[in-house]
Amino acid sequence: MTDMRALGYLIHLGSNMWRDTPLAGAAPDATDHVLMRCCADYNRCDDAVWRRLTDHAAARGFNMLVIDLGEGVQYPSRPELAVKGSWTPDKLRKELARLRSIGLEPIPKLNFSATHDTWLGEYHRMVSTPEYYRVCEDVLRDAYELFDHPRLFHIGYDEETAWHQQWHRYSVVRSGELWWHDFLKIESFVEKLGTRPWIWSDKIWHHEAEFLKRMPKTVLQSNWYYDAEFTEEELEKAKASEDRKAYVKAYRTLEKAGYDQLPAASNWGCDINFEKTVRYCRKWIAPERLKGFMTAPWWLTEKKKEAKCLAAIDLAAAAMEKERLGLL
């Protein structure tokens, strides 16, 4: 798929991407939300649920699957990152072939935000060191080869703030020149591999001038916003914070600056978000820079949240059908 606009689904193969608190040590009354964010020493991806979700996405007209890899795969150059049940390279390759056969373009995702890198194991505590840079390049190269040279590679880089790490046992937040040094180092390496870097765009929310000055236009942008209010009137009526207004504004700012975008929506906060994201972004983003849409339900590939993930697929498919019929 090259020219066709993407309709993507974000699916989790790995899960150790939030808190560094071990799952085994979680409080007895911990909610599903907390448990999902703890790190586990085994792969929590349910193969049967994975199959049903991917088949359903293909049946509903999706053409892209963004795979959050994390610790979910055994990296040939870094076997120490695997956990019990991590997919072998052979298993992953066979599944990627199946996905392509049903019309889903598989795209690798590895998140290098210091808030979301628990999957890096001991290297999670070595951020910005020579060994950290080596392991990042090793897993990027491995994933690039395992995916047979994909045209896009999502490298994350969202939510690297102290607030987002308040529940971590070990916290590290890069800022200023160090954040840009590390980001541009990874971004450049991905481009040298022969693929296009893709990131979450929330860095722009509170560092707009710096972002517009330093973010390469070659990087595909996924701004994300999961609430129901988009217009100025809706935001004012909801008494939205200045932060929330900035989240929505970012779509327009990125467009004005000439960045390619693939907006991310979700049923995490409400069921109407995907439809309203499509409506808003079609209005404000030029067709040649609007590369598609992605839904990200943010639940793991487990039976207990399968219905929520299926609903995310259905809501996105319904919104795209409305768009096709001119009802948005």
Where are these regions (language model features)?
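Hydrophobic alpha-helix position signal
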Residues: 57, 99, 190, 254, ...
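Charged, low-complexity C-terminal accessory regions
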Residues: 116, 150, 154, 163-167, ...
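Short, basic, helix/turn surface patches
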Residues: 90-96, 135-140, 223-233, 284-301, ...
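Aromatic-lined carbohydrate-binding surfaces of glycoside hydrolases
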Residues: 7-220, 225
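Substrate-binding cleft of secreted/luminal carbohydrate-active enzymes
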Residues: 257-328
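Well-ordered, non-membrane alpha-helical segments in soluble/globular domains
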Residues: 46, 50-51, 88-92, 132-137, ...
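Substrate-binding cleft/loops of secretory-pathway carbohydrate-active enzymes
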Residues: 124, 197-240, 269-285, 302
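Extracellular/periplasmic catalytic domains that process cell-envelope and extracellular macromolecules
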Residues: 1-4, 146-147, 213-216, 254, ...
